[in-house]
From Swiss-Prot:
Residues 1-35 form a transit peptide. The gene is NIPSNAP1. The modification N6-succinyllysine is found at K146, K193. GO terms for molecular function: protein-macromolecule adaptor activity. Ubiquitous. Highest expression in liver. This is Protein NipSnap homolog 1. SUPFAM superfamilies: Dimeric alpha+beta barrel. It comes from Homo sapiens. Keywords: Acetylation, Autophagy, Mitochondrion, Phosphoprotein, Transit peptide, Ubl conjugation.
Length: 284
């Protein structure tokens, strides 16, 4: 059986213009066949259908939605443990005013505390309708907002550190919409190898259908400013048991295993956060 598997590898590599086989290639091919038992030959066929064409456009142009000009900002605030309750109360008193004020072209998408992952952490997701001009308009107005400046001064005493990123949403994900609760949310963050964002998007565009039956898919984003080649997938579940059952169900669907097989090599690092919504969060 081994020589036959090796000859397949040689043929495939000649067609693709790659180098000759190595010992690890034979093991990888065998693992791929075992990985998709119910789909004989899928490993060989996938060598041809998953090739990504070279592009001249930026991946932000190719992967983001054309019909909207939304820009997103995600904030991670690491709070001093003794101040977490006070931080939440202060946040819930001030941020909704910006969300409801039509003079500010920004809106809250979601606000959470991290439950499992980094402790004593708050995560905020904002939407700027109108892209970078809306972001700058909002930032300029906040410089003259006395209440917001006081909020920032008070908040700074409660924080250990903070960071943010500007994001675009993938074209094949639905735009995040308010949800009734109670739900828990999972933010899965993937740090990709440079140059692999388009391949990631191509694979997930085919695979997202396997993760929508229970309405668990909330939003998918990729970074534009801040740490680059970072992807965030946001999911909603009723509870941890529901999360377990939903994720296991995906593995029983033909095609999901191939998506995992082809996207795992693109990842340098991945992280999962389980988050609980704050009272003000539109995503409950």
């Amino acid at each position: 059986m081994a020589p036959r598997l090796c000859s397949i590898s040689v043929t495939a590599r000649r067609l693709l213009g790659g180098p000759g086989p190595r010992a690890g290639d034979v093991a990888s091919a065998a693992a791929a066949r075992f990985y998709s038992k119910d789909n004989e030959g899928s490993w060989f066929r996938s060598l041809f259908v998953h090739k990504v064409d070279p592009r001249k456009d930026a991946h932000s142009t190719l992967l983001s939605k054309k019909e909207t000009s939304n820009l997103y900002k995600i904030q991670f605030h690491n709070v001093k443990p003794e101040y977490l309750d006070a931080y939440n109360s202060l946040t819930e008193a001030v941020l909704p005013k910006l969300h409801l004020d039509e003079d500010y072209p920004c809106s809250l998408v979601g606000n959470w505390n991290t439950w499992y992952g980094e402790q004593d952490q708050a995560v905020h997701l904002w939407r700027f309708s109108g892209g970078y001009p809306a972001l700058m308009d909002c930032m300029n107005k906040l410089k003259n907002n006395k209440e917001y400046l006081e909020f920032r001064r008070e908040r700074s005493q409660m924080l250990l550190s903070r960071r943010n990123q500007l994001l675009l949403e993938f074209s094949f994900w639905n735009e995040p919409q308010p949800r009734m609760g109670p739900n828990i949310y999972e933010l899965r963050t993937y740090k990709l190898k440079p140059g692999t964002m388009i391949e990631w998007g191509n694979n997930w565009a085919r695979a997202i259908k396997y993760r929508q039956e229970n309405q668990e898919a909330v939003g998918g984003f990729f970074s534009q400013i801040g740490e680059l080649y970072v992807v965030h997938h946001l999911w909603a579940y009723k509870d941890l048991q529901s999360r377990e059952e939903t994720r296991n169900a995906a593995w029983r669907k033909r095609g999901w295993d191939e998506n995992v097989y082809y996207t795992v090599p693109l990842v340098r690092h991945m992280e999962s956060r389980i988050m609980i919504p704050l009272k003000i969060s539109p995503l409950q």
